[in-house]
Amino acid sequence: SPSRGLGDVYKRQIRNYVETIKEGESGYRIYIKDNVPLNRSDREAYDYLGIEPAKVADAKKKKENLDIEIRDFMCKNFYDIRTFGAVMTTFVKDKLNCGQVRGPVQLSFAKSVDPIMPQEVTITRVAITTEADAEKKGTEMGRKYIVPYALYRAEGYVSANLARKTTGFSEEDLELLWQAIMNMFEVDHAAARGKMATRELIVFKHDSELGNAPAYKLFDLVKAERREGVDTPRAYSDYNVSVEEAALPSGVECIRI
């Protein structure tokens, strides 16, 4: 955010974690993957239902529930569709109503609590690509950007109603999501991310399917504030993270993981 100097973080690690932990286990495959054409996964639904891609229109005339059967197949087999939803362009192009699935889980971009100061680091590459390069130069220079320290806050939503009516997202899937959020950086370390980690997960659990309070009111109860005397935060311990649990609405429980 240029105007405030706040940093943003985008999600990808959850899918990577689930794929690593489940390793091809039935029902936990990942739909959105690097360098894998989406229509390859889409065709699996056609194969499962015995439909030739060129004859989808004829199959739809014979099966009134074809859209639902395809959607259910994709949700059952791919964890990220069941969780986050997906836009499956193969089915959209074939004029099927299952091409866009709304997922019960939505996560916002994470934003830094305080302004950040990215630093540019110069690195030296000692390896040479070709023999011709070796004759001309000894090393190559490069740049890398790092953020020495920042505390980020992300907010998310889980719709029990959509989970039940649309994708079949289950309690077991939810537990796996919590596990992924807490541990996703532990299986995918990188020099640029340093010691990046999820420090706490705060969950508001409602006792009704449609919820007992608006999400924004619950998010406002969570505060991340610098401790007294700290001008430049350099560690998680420089912050005090609190939840105003006394102000929780009836039927809402706060779980801190």
Positions of the model-derived regions?
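RAMP-family (Cas7-like) RNA-binding scaffold and associated basic/acidic loop-rich RNA-contact surfaces
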Residues: K22-I257
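Single conserved hydrophobic/aromatic residue that forms the stacking wall/gate
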Residues: S1-L6, Y10
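Short active-site loop/helix that positions an aromatic residue
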Residues: R12-T20
